[in-house]
């Protein structure tokens, strides 16, 4: 069985809007970022965007990132697959053998997930279930809420269904149903990697992160293939971000050559996060999801070595939208260095200012690119900063 499959027609969403129902921001290979009211075309033939009422041709290979609406995960269970995919939705069913779990997604309809691909199934209030580690010698376990922390129930998974998870703890004669809200997470060891290599990564407005193949952009939405060849049309108003692979190396996929972090008083406030803000939530800046990026908190210094084929570097920097909830007015100094040379700098960068664009910065393979965020006025209070899609652009040919 493929890792994901549709159940009837539910996984193919047919949007009824006659025109694109949400604008998008396009990040292009030449370092330009524009807001488009409409985007049509495909990754093979290229795209046509409507920007300020004028047509703009986007050649094949030039589109790197599409930013849509803000991501705001609802209070729903989440299925965490090997490789990083996350699908959110109600658990509505499964097969008797326990090989499949049916997830009712708000944006994809009902999708069947192969249990062989599953790392974890988490309750709505658990944001990072992979932090719940299985002890050595335990392959399947429920983490059940206790007065303090969690109790671990090792045992055997039997089935998924609308009641939740049918599980048999060790030492118990028969399995029973555990409601999803009754547990923190189900953890499974030995999940299988995805068989295919998706051409893009999609983030939805509800916080899904899914590897996809982009088929076409049309007025009614983005036509996609999910894992296992499932066809789906995602409404533009459900699109958080879409990162197209190829021609670039995202820093969030690379290992830093050096990391230096400290708070105003010395201790690290929040360590940097990959494809998440400094608190572990979705990257959202300027009212739009970011998708690929780095979430940091001052003081932060992250250094990366340009890979083979690197010809230039690009990023934008902004405060994460979560800062708005704090009622603070944080300020930071931000800079980018290539080697020891400062090539981009914004001092006294304040929350509420628009994202700052570095432009294309020339680099060569082996160069060290360093992203710095330093304390500004107001110590380090609220200094949650997002590096938006920092990437090395690879030379062609």
Placement of each model-derived feature along the sequence:
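Bacterial N-terminal signal peptides that target proteins for export
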Residues: 1-8
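Short polar catalytic/cofactor-binding loops
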Residues: 30-32, 260
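Secondary-structure boundary/capping motif
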Residues: 33, 110, 338-340
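Intrinsic disorder/low-complexity segments enriched in polar/small residues
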Residues: 21-22, 346
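Gly-Asp-aromatic-enriched flexible segments
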Residues: 176, 180-200, 220, 225-397
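Hydrophobic h-region of N-terminal signal peptides that target proteins for export
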Residues: 8-20
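Extended non-catalytic domains of envelope/secretory-pathway proteins
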Residues: 22, 26-30, 37-44, 52-249, ...
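Polar low-complexity intrinsically disordered regions enriched in Ser/Thr and small residues
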Residues: 11, 34, 44, 56, ...
